[in-house]
């Protein structure tokens, strides 16, 4: 699914009932912002937009994943071309602080216009033909021998290294000590970067 809301509930449940029997033992994750979908048991493994994740964090949802896409453009981290790299790199620290175990970004190599009506050259057209913020649809560029990593992808890899380093520091020093090193982490909210 992609961000089901209250009005989509019946259709969501029908679609889930069709797919779920064919995926025994698989973890099904759904991109959503509605905390009600989780509390009502409709979604067991939410992947939440970072600008809507607060109630999930406040209620200690286990195995919580986060995501960004075109809607996360104000006051939160993301990986758009027009954003400074610190808005990308902070994501790893925030994921560690809030026990977020996974991250989804939909656009790895979407080198098309919106709805895939035309192929684009991402070196020339970065916004899917005006549909999304520049860079939202892709993290890599097409290369002769495979994908070419973008600076944004490399910075995000560093964010994940930061997350792992903080986890290791937590094992060695304890969580409170690491938070203290980060200035108690008060300014590391997932909103208001």
Write out the residue ranges for each language-model feature.
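Catalytic-core regions of glycoside hydrolase
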Residues: 1-116
């Amino acid at each position: 699914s992609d961000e089901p809301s209250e009005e989509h509930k019946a259709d969501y449940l029908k679609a889930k009932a069709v797919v779920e029997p064919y995926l025994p033992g698989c973890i099904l994750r759904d991109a959503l912002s509605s905390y009600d979908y989780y509390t009502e048991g409709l979604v067991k493994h939410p992947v939440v937009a970072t600008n809507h994740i607060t109630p999930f964090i406040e209620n200690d949802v286990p195995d919580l994943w986060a995501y960004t896409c075109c809607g996360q453009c104000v006051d939160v981290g993301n990986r758009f071309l027009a954003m400074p790299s610190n808005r990308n790199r902070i994501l790893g620290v925030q994921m560690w602080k809030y026990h977020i175990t996974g991250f989804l970004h939909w656009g790895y190599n979407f080198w098309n216009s919106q709805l895939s009506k035309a192929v684009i050259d991402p070196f020339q057209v970065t916004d899917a033909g005006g549909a999304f913020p520049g860079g939202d649809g892709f993290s890599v560029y097409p290369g002769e021998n495979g994908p070419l990593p973008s600076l944004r992808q490399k910075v995000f890899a560093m964010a994940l290294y930061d997350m792992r380093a903080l986890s290791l520091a937590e094992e060695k020093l304890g969580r409170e000590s690491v938070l203290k090193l980060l200035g108690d982490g008060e300014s590391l909210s997932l909103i208001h970067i």
